[in-house]
Amino acid sequence: MKSRAVALVIATTAVGLLATAGSATAGQGDTFCTWGGTPAAPTGIITLNPGITNTPSTGPIQFTATGPLGGSGCTGKLTFTGSFEPGATCAVGSAFHAKATGLPPVTRVEGQPSIAGTGPVLLYDAHGNVVGSEQAQFLTTLANESDPGYLNCNTPRGLTEAFWSDTIELFASK
């Protein structure tokens, strides 16, 4: 069972990295940032209340995801504060909505349903315009058995904290 979970996390992370790398040629003049470190050295932290388990949630799950920004023109700390819609599990995430602080002009985000902690996220400005995207990788270290979150999805309390990293693309102004 452990080997299947590890294989799923590794495969999903690889798909997320390929999707992010594939978008790197999307637009001339776009800005690319790291957020929460790298997959090899994640520094982002997400906290979840209540914790996510392997049973679909019956209500929203509140979360805060925060981490340092890196890359050319990307400094400071970005934070998402929001909630996952009912139905979230550790393996299949539900859509989410969040307020964003720390990366102007981004003020809010909308995440799509995801598999194993990776999923597309659209970044919006205060006027409702899409100004960027990011590929969430919330379960970056769960393949590591020394990670405290490794088995928490199987407990009644669930996964309440995890490390992650991802890449952000801010679209060039037209």
Question: Residues of each region from the PLM?
Answer:
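Cleaved targeting-peptide boundary
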Residues: 26-35
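Extended beta-strand/beta-hairpin segments
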Residues: 35-36, 71, 168
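Predominantly extracellular/secreted and cell-surface proteins with exposed
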Residues: 42-138
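Extracellularly exposed regions in secreted/surface proteins, prominently low-complexity, repeat-rich
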Residues: 139-174
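Secretory targeting and sorting signals
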Residues: 1-26
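Processing junctions and N-termini across compartments
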Residues: 20, 27, 67-68, 83-84, ...
